[in-house]
UniProtKB/Swiss-Prot annotation:
This is Protein UL140. Keywords: Host membrane, Membrane, Transmembrane, Transmembrane helix. It is found in: Host membrane. It is a single-pass membrane protein. Disulfide bonds: none annotated. The keyword DNA-binding does not apply. The chain crosses the membrane at residues 28-48. It comes from Human cytomegalovirus (strain Merlin) (HHV-5). GO terms for cellular component: host cell membrane; membrane.
Amino acid sequence: MTPAQTNGTTTVHPHGAKNGSGGSALPTLVVFGFIVTLLFFLFMLYFWNNDVFRKLLRCAWIQRCCDRFDAWQDEVIYRRPSRRSQSDDESRTNSVSSYVLLSPASDGGFDNPALTEAVDSVDDWATTSVFYATSDETADTERRDSQQLLIELPPEPLPPDVVAAMQKAVKRAVQNALRHSHDSWQLHQTL
């Protein structure tokens, strides 16, 4: 215990602490951990769903930072026109191709026809089967079609020469195994 002088009186503090010094660092660590965790979740939300992130944080400075990062990401990483470059008055569809292929290949979009075709096929699938409700009749037809596809057909019989070649290969493998094993009598008995 260390005595400390305060206005002519002596106060004794356990553990030798001075007047005015903080107690434990635990509350500071808890607050710091909470802030870091919150920032981490906001960072993950930004990459998971950019629009929700923008709606949650309506700060103009954060919006400008997001716009700059999105423009950089579109130009440098994805090599496509910026998704925020279109005016907000234009109607945007929820299709993949309208989001990814904003312009033809000559304007900086995808110049790979296979990639363009793949995106178009995903877009067709998404607009026809996932995002739109189907009628009961269409659902029944699709269910019947999928059940017909799941019927297993028996395999076609193999030609006799293939069967004979397979039997000969198995017999040769067994003979080689018997020849190279130390315990060939026991292996022969089990076969």
